[in-house]
């Protein structure tokens, strides 16, 4: 396997993919913290792990190397104690701590562990009852900080490895995530990308040190020259235009077109890939609820303009826009839930539109969305069904749970 990144489509044969196996962080969700941690329910960890292992084995059985972000982080921090210390300092600063009693106590506690255990603990979260730290500040005794059981909050969304970063061509975006609950995830990515030999010299199109937000579920690689990005609850239009400029200007980038698709800004449709995915050269899944009653949706084609500016063309027909940027005479939009007014929103809620292509016309998706699965098969798609009862409680499907590192070029 070649090192680095090579993702020039959504559908090229999947050869290497980044995952995170759900761990103790999932059991550190409570009914009181679900909203803050972006969950609607609490998965049963034992079954979620079995389901995730089945998902990973499905990918391996079909020729993909599975790489775990927690293992990459462990390798980086084991190699350099200086990098480990720098990371911990960065992590604690972003969590709001400064040198002093709590900061020093957390540093001592985390560095006393093996590196593997430290990484697992960072994902799981550090409870206040794990450390004997004298509480002297009022904020430790009253208010929201005092009510929090954790010094470092758990990262239960981490099994959705799509979002903290996005492989794009030969490079990657490391993302400024929208909500604090997920921001440490892309900090881990930042240190892995900067220090792991696997990614030496990999270009970073955009790092996480921005004020505007973007998440990988909104970033779709349509082909070697075109990316689609959702204007969504989690990704801003300003970010998209800035990223387009960066891609157009960088000589290592092959991208000259960005298709911005505006979708409803709500939790059920948090990213573009929850309502729209590419599954073949000319076939896509789509949730019809992203369009108005007349079938219209705001779509914008961004291309290089004069004086390093970006030219923007506005359309309201998704199918026409896709045909234009992909140079296709026809394409097949396959509706989630067969477009049924009950089945479509039900199956979209359970990630029926969130499919992972592992080759052209061959996908992995949840078994529970049987209306969509049967329709996909009728349209000639080869479907690998994976278990979903617990993983799906996190509101993400097969694409959400995976970050391709290497795909064969088409």
Curated annotation (Swiss-Prot):
Query: A Gene Ontology CC term for this entry?
Result: cytoplasm
In which pathway is this protein known to take part?
Amino-acid degradation; L-arginine degradation via ADI pathway; carbamoyl phosphate from L-arginine: step 1/2
Q: What class of enzyme is it?
A: hydrolase
Superkingdom assignment: Bacteria
Where, by residue number, is the active site?
400 (amidino-cysteine intermediate)
Cell compartment(s), UniProt? Cytoplasm
One example of the protein's molecular function in GO is:
arginine deiminase activity
Name the Enzyme Commission number(s) assigned to this protein: 3.5.3.6
A Gene Ontology BP annotation from the UniProt entry: arginine catabolic process to ornithine
Keyword Hydrolase carried by entry: yes
Which reactions are catalysed by this chain?
L-arginine + H2O = L-citrulline + NH4(+)
Keyword line: Arginine metabolism, Cytoplasm, Hydrolase
User: What HAMAP family does this protein's entry cite?
Assistant: Arg_deiminase (MF_00242)
Give the similarity note: Belongs to the arginine deiminase family.
Please report the name of this protein according to its UniProt entry: Arginine deiminase
Organism expressing this protein natively: Lactococcus lactis subsp. lactis (strain IL1403)
